[in-house]
Every structure is written in C-alpha cells, then in structure tokens.
C-alpha cells in the first residue's frame, strides 16, 4: 500500500511504556472530541462507567437502548475510546454495497482484528450496533465520526464512516479500512457480549469464547 508503513514497522507497545502512539492518542483527543461533539447527543456523563470500574480495567456495561438510530456514543474501557454506533437498515444495506466493497482494503475482515462473533460483514454481534475500538491502526490517533445525510448513498471515495484527522485514513461504519490510506488494518472490535436485549458488557466475551484484544494484528 503506497505511503503505508509495513505492519512490522509499527511495533506493539510494551505494557506500561509510553510510546509515540500513546502521545498521539492524547494529543489528538481534543481534536477528535470537537468533531464528535457535533454528532453526539450528550449522553457521555450518564453512560460512562464509575471511577472504580475504570481503575480496575474491568468490563463496562452500557445501555444501548438509550442510543438512538444514527447516534454514536463513546465510552472508555481500559483507557481506550470505544465507539458504539446504532446503525439503521439503510446503513446496513450500504455496508453490503459492491461499490463500497471495491474501495475497501479488507472487506471480508480476513485479518484478525475482531473476535469470532464479529467475523461477519457487519463485524458485530448484532447488526444494528457497531462496537469498535476508536484508535486508528496507523499511529493511534482517534478517528472522527462522519456520516452522510443519505446513509444509502455511496459517493466516490467516501460513503461516510470514520476519518482520521492525523494522516487521512478512512473507515466505513463497520470499521473496515479503505484502500490507499496509511492505516494497514480495520479498526479492532473489543471483546463484548449482550447480557440482555439492550445491555452490552464491553470487555467480556460470551460464554465459551476466548478472545483478548491484545491478540489482534494492530491496535
């Protein structure tokens, strides 16, 4: 891929060691937050976990029933932003459009960036809810959430989704990366499971499923 560092040249950080990716993650947080604020209903305070849960790095419960169609909420898990987007039938239809698939680097999610229960075209346990780690797989910036007014539209080079303001990488609403951008992989999908029809527990797999976020190709 032109202008893209090879996966081997982007090493995974060792636990507890600050890296360039850590710096970019913090430095771009303000920029990403400004972009996200224009598209989010202010649910952050009531949806974020309490301080003790964050400190322990344990699973985080989220009531997705409060997230309206076309709305995205961001929660924190293990100090990472987790994007939770309520996708409409039109958005799901667009994810299967051949014009879109032709623009993607890994449309079938062959690279291991998701748990087995997200090995599908919508990369999720439930099609209507996209749940992604909001960290660009290039150098760790936080992508901006952009969606078109018409979710069914597929325009040249951009059908709406996630755009990284640092170096221009683009992802669709399933977190699949576009061709010809610096990011080498799709956005990771964290471990999670639904404990009820409307409650998702981020950081915990369904019974009898083993998956750790650290096992993906690139965070």
Tell me what each language-model feature is.
Residues 2-3, 23-44:
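N-terminal export signals
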